[in-house]
Regions:
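Aromatic-anchored segments of alpha-helical transmembrane domains
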Residues: 1, 58-70, 116-128, 173-184
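Membrane-interface helix-loop-helix junctions at boundaries between adjacent transmembrane segments
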Residues: 1-55, 72, 76
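Membrane-interface interhelical loops and short amphipathic "cap" helices
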Residues: 2-19, 67-86, 125-131, 188-198
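Hydrophobic cores of alpha-helical transmembrane segments in multi-pass inner/ER membrane proteins
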Residues: 22-38, 88-104, 140-154, 202-221
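Membrane-interfacial loop-to-transmembrane alpha-helix junctions, especially the N-terminal start
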Residues: 44-58, 105-116, 160-172, 227-230
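Loop-centered beta-sheet repeat module
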Residues: 45-97
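A contiguous, surface-oriented mixed alpha/beta subdomain in the mid-to-C-terminal portion of proteins
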Residues: 82-150
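C-terminal transmembrane helix-loop-helix hairpin of multi-pass membrane proteins
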Residues: 136-144, 151-230
């Protein structure tokens, strides 16, 4: 699918969600899952497993590129407000879910940040032919996101807070929203376009994901003991 995108063979939403392409994606996920499940240590992740997780996350982001704010950024310029806000919240929740799942394997902060950096590098391929400046901007956003993830993971592993998984998941989702807001402001400045979104609207793109991220964090907690699931 990435190869077809680079060559311009297929564009738009429909090719991404056709059964044939979904089967290709499923095959990719199964191969990546094999690398993940056959890792030497079941208690931790090696570099191959980290790359597998990052690639799986990147594939999900690629499948949903039609509702990815970094790739569908013009929806913020063309006043498609519902789609624009929904894309940020959806992808922020996905970023939070990935954190809740991967952090249980005792990954280092560096490994966790690599998962997010690689996923951003994957989606930066999409606009690389026609809009190289956007590719660079997405890569920079990925670096900022990975730096924030590093700090969040470091805090998660050193704190004894009884709600650390929920707070961390909320911070991941909020960080995604914050990084995108910075990305949007940089994009509008570089391209000389006026944003219709005001300060409180942009602030909502950061605070709303915080709420959903906190709720997703409960998925990493045992409903009986209240402890983090391992």
């Amino acid at each position: 699918a990435i190869w077809h995108t680079l060559l311009g063979i297929e564009t738009g939403v429909e090719p991404l969600i056709t059964p044939s392409h979904l089967m290709l994606f499923l095959g990719s996920f199964l191969m990546l899952d094999y690398v993940f499940t056959t890792r030497p240590s079941k208690e931790s992740l090696d570099n191959a497993s980290i790359f597998s997780a990052a690639t799986s996350y990147g594939l999900v982001m690629f499948i949903t590129l039609f509702i990815n704010p970094f790739l569908n950024i013009w929806s913020f310029i063309e006043r498609e407000d519902e789609l624009a806000a929904g894309s940020v919240i959806l992808q922020a929740m996905l970023a939070s879910f990935i954190f809740v799942y991967v952090v249980r394997f005792k990954v280092s902060p560096k490994q966790m940040s690599l998962v997010y950096l690689v996923s951003f590098l994957y989606i930066s391929i999409n606009p690389s032919l026609g809009e190289f400046n956007r590719t660079i901007l997405i890569c920079i956003s990925g670096l900022i996101m990975s730096a924030l993830i590093y700090q969040i993971t470091k805090w998660y592993q050193t704190t004894n807070h009884d709600r650390k998984i929920q707070v961390s998941a909320a911070l991941v989702a909020g960080s995604y929203g914050l990084v995108f807001v910075l990305h949007l402001l940089a994009f509008s400045t570089l391209n000389g376009v006026d944003l219709s979104w005001r300060f409180y609207g942009l602030g909502g793109l950061v605070t709303t994901p915080l709420l959903f991220g906190y709720m997703l964090g409960n998925l990493g907690v045992s409903p009986t003991s209240g402890e983090v699931v391992r």
